[in-house]
Amino acid sequence: MRDYIPKYLNAFLLAFATFAVGFAIFIAKDSNSSSHLYFSTSSSLWTSSFSPAFITVSIFLTVHRFREKRKRNGSNPGSGYWKRDGKVEAELATARVLIREAQLNYSSTTSSPLGDEDYVPHGDIYRNPYAFHRSYLLMEKMFKIYVYEEGDPPIFHYGLCKDIYSMEGLFLNFMENDVLKYRTRDPDKAHVYFLPFSVVMILHHLFDPVVRDKAVLERVIADYVQIISKKYPYWNTSDGFDHFMLSCHDWGHRATWYVKKLFFNSIRVLCNANISEYFNPEKDAPFPEINLLTGDINNLTGGLDPISRTTLAFFAGKSHGKIRPVLLNHWKEKDKDILVYENLPDGLDYTEMMRKSRFCICPSGHEVASPRVPEAIYSGCVPVLISENYVLPFSDVLNWEKFSVSVSVKEIPELKRILMDIPEERYMRLYEGVKKVKRHILVNDPPKRYDVFNMIIHSIWLRRLNVKLL
């Protein structure tokens, strides 16, 4: 930080930050709700302990960092750089004010007062339904995404729309065909810029499984960023802060490492949202891993009513990673209520088992994300999350505690007791929460308002609101 801030500002910033912390603590203690402190993450917009002071400090330091970096590089944001359309930043500034106003005026006893012919967010599955609704409507009204046209399929502008990486392919194809309605052909009017490469397709077509040279990612992605940064002014103007990439591949985070500004500055939208692998929820956005085996999106949802669900908990899956071996060691085919299998026995159907279970166990494998989480929600089965360092999808908006159960690795031996001890009243609230949240995890073609694809866009929108560019 000292490299970016002149010495004469250190004392001022220290005093200002101290005041901000004190102010936030006062506000938090005075609140009837949680006393947690939230810095400039997107989740701060939805929590009642929100402190505008922290946002102000963060924005000031971010803008100051841009200015100082350019001065040291012999350039000036007002000279030799493309001048950003003032309307773009003015729109974002207006959105910030309106969203904060909605957050501060929120009452837990009311839903959003805003009109909406399709859906009005309400209930405790949201951190703040009013602020979310206000933000979503503003996004629909003003958010514009520019998709760089450079690059050819199948590496760029294209992705596979089936199997475990289907979400990456579907998003690329929807953006390419402007199905989501946020794309602009005028880059000067854009709020964010999309780098339309597919990590899955790079590895599928260019990666040699024998040689296993991961440098192919570096060559493709670094070359692409170099091309667009020379042809257009937008990357250099913002240092990549208003650019984003999206990947559901396990190596999605690795793919960004080879371009440091992409790794540290840009919005990385990843299924594998692992904090231990430098996923930064202040700027990066998690989204769900959904396994569309054949690409068919019909009949994804279903399930019995709570009274007819005869199985307490269910899991079937291979033993890999650090968590699953622990689960299988303790529970594999050892209990009539906790049904855990490494290989599903003949005569049992995976989907039907989820649809008749009260709880679906969702342990991380090699990577933190698991397609079992959306599968459980589709089945009306309360997810039991067993993971470490995993940032849950859309957790800046959704309150996962209201429709899932979290169990730590050390609590795996006590899994049955934990689930049996959940009162029926609480289980019913969790079950109803799963039914409500399904709308936001569901895959639709074409996409529908508030579905998983629009929620991904909303996550990107929130990250863009966290950055102020001059």
Curated annotation (Swiss-Prot):
Lumenal-facing ranges: 29-470
Lineage top rank: taxon: Eukaryota
InterPro entries: Exostosin (IPR004263), Exostosin_GT47 (IPR040911)
EC number: 2.4.-.-
Positions of transmembrane segments: 8-28
Subcellular location(s) per record: Golgi apparatus membrane
Annotated coiled-coil segments of the chain: none
GO MF, one annotated term: glycosyltransferase activity
Glycosylation sites per record: 32, 73, 105, 236, 274, 299
Top-level class of the enzyme under EC nomenclature: transferase
The keyword Membrane appears for this protein: yes
Presence of the UniProt keyword Transport in the record: no
Membrane topology: Single-pass type II membrane protein
Biological process terms in GO annotation: cell wall organization; protein glycosylation
GO terms for cellular component: Golgi membrane
Family recorded in the similarity comment: Belongs to the glycosyltransferase 47 family.
Functional description taken from the UniProt entry: May be involved in cell wall biosynthesis.
Protein name per UniProt: Probable glycosyltransferase At3g07620
